[in-house]
């Protein structure tokens, strides 16, 4: 309810924001990206929302593009609109910059990204304790945050994903409770969110 997620299966517990963003980068994006595809990040990003995408771009041949900020330190929405095109598969942005405190209009970005059938990934680590989070109203595909940003313990986090997107994700870690059935040569996995 707090995130306004449409169903509980859309909320996956992780070890933190970095883990959640890596799961999206390597479990969702990497298997789908190919040479000629584009990933857009901004200069406002924490390393946790930049380095995984650099790695995915290098491994897939996708092009990593970077949107800047305007003279006030805000995301340059005009430049973002120029960068997004039919090759854009992923736009991944912070909701609030950890350096400047810049607040990104996520709903505005989502409208633009979805016009081109891209996905929007949001790093909400800095926003979660200070701003209301409504994943449905913002229309994000994925959103990540950590418990310690809300005075919780370290080592816990959340990955919200639209259910259809989560179902398309490949696991990035294997074993434990995620396994439904295992044979000497293969395994099947539990349904979301355990998988």
What do the predicted segments below correspond to?
Residues 1-195:
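Pyridoxal 5′-phosphate
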């Amino acid at each position: 309810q707090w995130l306004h997620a449409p169903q509980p299966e859309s909320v996956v517990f992780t070890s933190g924001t970095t883990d959640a963003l890596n799961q999206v980068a390597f479990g969702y994006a990497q298997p789908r990206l190919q040479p000629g595809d584009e990933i857009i990040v901004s200069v406002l990003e924490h390393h946790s929302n930049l380095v995984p995408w650099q790695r995915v771009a290098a491994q897939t041949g996708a092009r990593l593009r970077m949107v800047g900020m305007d003279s006030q330190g805000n995301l340059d929405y005009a430049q973002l609109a120029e960068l997004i095109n039919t090759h854009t598969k992923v736009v991944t942005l912070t909701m609030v910059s950890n350096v400047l405190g810049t607040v990104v209009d996520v709903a505005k970005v989502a409208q633009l990204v979805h016009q081109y059938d891209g996905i929007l990934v949001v790093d909400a680590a800095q926003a979660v304790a200070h701003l209301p989070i409504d994943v449905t109203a913002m229309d994000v595909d994925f959103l990540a945050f950590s418990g310690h940003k809300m005075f919780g313990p370290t080592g816990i986090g959340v990955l919200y994903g639209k259910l259809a997107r989560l179902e398309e994700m490949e696991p990035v870690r294997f074993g434990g409770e995620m396994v439904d059935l295992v044979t000497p040569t293969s395994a099947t996995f539990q349904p979301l969110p355990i998988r």
